[in-house]
Amino acid sequence: MRKPINLLREFSVPLIAGVITALAWANLDPRGYDALIHQPSFGGVSLHFLVNELFMVLFFGIAAAEITQSCLPGGDLNPPRKAVNPLLATLGGVIGPVLVYLSLNAVIGDPTLTKGWGIPTATDIALAWLVARLVFGAGHPAVSFLLLLAVADDAIGLAIIAVFYPDPVHPTEPMWLFLTVAGIVAAYILRGARAKSYWPYVLVGGGLSWTGLFKAHLHPALALVFIIPFLPHPPRESAHLFEENPRDTSPLARFEHDWKIVVDFGLFLFGLANAGVRFSSVGTATWLVLTALLVGKTAGILTMGSLGKALGFPLPDRVGFKELALTGLVAGMGLTVALFVAGVAFVDPDIEGAAKMGALLSGGVLPVAVALGRILKVRRIP
């Protein structure tokens, strides 16, 4: 029997609880919610800052660790040929939503919404994994396919945040990025010195990287993305995504093991700090984001996955047209990264709230995907 604490993490209960709490609080007591989240009540900084610029360092650090492990020999994205179809599907899952978002906005003709194109590009790994297990069963190859797609999707999402979404209020000061480069150099030196703990990498390399990004008015939450790949790891990866190898005691594996539970439960605070939008916030940006997530993701993944198969890069066993289409629909669940991008894409709080509502409404994929799975008679594999 699985422990209750593992069940809570597996079913994303902390994140969902944070989102529900934020929605209820922001609509019942908006002043009280705003005072807690946005007022500088914690040593001169707000809870929103502590969550989005400090806690999210760990979230993106864990994502970087999973991507690094997947790219190692024996990992799920290595050798490259094995990953071609999921990577093509990932590309479709990014390009599709962008094209849908920008095309619809061109028809609407609202240039103030253009910057939101990056919001629907990322997939919420944890929630998509949960829904995929309900639709396909835990043992279905479509679940592993979706996980590979979601991890690669997150890698592209990190790049989009770093390149296309600088601080909307303060101009970028590139000179400070030398500190980030210094952090990378420090991590490289530590690796050469065979430092056996991840702490020097995180504190020295990560600290320099965070300070450089913060001073440059970029997103310090990405600080560890540049450091984690330097953590020592075994020459081959023997576990699949989200699996732990108890024999792997490398700094990379220990970092993920030690901080994954902190991140999983800390996502309650992320949901609380970022999902507090009023129901009256629904607007044009809501429908742009929601349509781009559901239609763009599904069409993009279905198109590029089918193209990969036609080019000789096969889909996994038991993944045909209907399974691929359902995978695309499930990948349209954008929450964590989508909320983060919405918060940095728009300065206007009304537009930001409307865009966040679109990301939140994508959670409605769950009952739709389960129902379609039964209608299409998708065979579940426990």
UniProtKB/Swiss-Prot annotation:
Membrane topology note: Multi-pass membrane protein
Any Gene Ontology biological process: regulation of pH
Superkingdom of source: Bacteria
A single GO cellular-component term on record: plasma membrane
Keyword Transport: yes
Keywords associated with the record: Antiport, Cell inner membrane, Cell membrane, Ion transport, Membrane, Sodium, Sodium transport, Transmembrane, Transmembrane helix, Transport
Catalytic reaction annotation: Na(+)(in) + 2 H(+)(out) = Na(+)(out) + 2 H(+)(in)
Family named by the database record: Belongs to the NhaA Na(+)/H(+) (TC 2.A.33) antiporter family.
Protein name: Na(+)/H(+) antiporter NhaA
Lineage start: Bacteria, Pseudomonadati, Thermodesulfobacteriota, Desulfuromonadia, Geobacterales
